[in-house]
Amino acid sequence: QLRDVTLVPRPVNRPVEMWQAIASGKSIPFMVQHGIKGMVTMNGEQITRMMFRQFRDEAAKIGRNLALGEDLTWGGGLYLADSIEEAMERVRPYHDERFKWFAPFGFVRYADDQGRPWGTPGAPVGVPTLEEGLRQKAWLLGPAEEVIGRLRELEAEYPGLEQVMLHWAEGMPADEWKDQLRRFAREVMPAFQPRAAEAAAAGS
């Protein structure tokens, strides 16, 4: 059995963090027992809420008292533009290309209004349109203030959440995605830096 892995060069930060995507709740008990952190990405709001709560509750069963969202990453699609309508128009081809591949395999992590995941007994199976993705809050679309507002909602609901992952929509040219990241850094990230600075000052 494999016990040790040597990495060259040696990681700067140790112990090395392990992150694993959470596709269903079945892997969560194993993850919390072994200190593996979770990535909950491209999920509807209700699925995300269920996964985050399950992760916290499973950790509590073994004596790990985590704040809601702690040791987790929230991931969503991103397209910044001057309006939501412009963002949707520009990202739609890439969004649709993504679900042409994912949807036939059942990789649509949305729920109905009762919290039932699509495709489970009693729940309807919808069409994963971009409009539905926006309604499910799996996408950050529009001007910076819209994106900041949604991230503030996540911050309020999940006080332990410190990591956000931005999804590079399949098929989007690399230069276009780099422009999106630059715009995110320029227009969105400054809204969150003062709080980080205040926390650092309080801890010193």
Locate each region found by the language model.
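Short glycine/threonine-rich loop-to-helix capping motif typified by GTGT followed
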Residues: 80-85, 173-183
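Glycine- and acidic
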Residues: 36-37, 134-137, 165-171
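Conserved, mostly hydrophobic/aromatic
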Residues: 18, 31, 55, 87, ...
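Hydrophobic faces of well-ordered beta-strands that scaffold small-molecule active sites
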Residues: 18-21, 36-41, 70-76, 162-166
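Internal, glycine-rich beta/alpha segment that forms the wall or movable "lid"
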Residues: 1-34, 49, 53, 62
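An alpha-helical appendage that flanks or caps ligand/catalytic pockets
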Residues: 1-7, 46-160, 193-204
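Glycine-rich, proline-tolerant flexible connector loops at the mouths of alpha/beta enzymes
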Residues: 42-43, 165-177
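Active-site-proximal loop/turn and secondary-structure-junction residues that shape catalytic pockets
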Residues: 24, 44, 78-80, 170
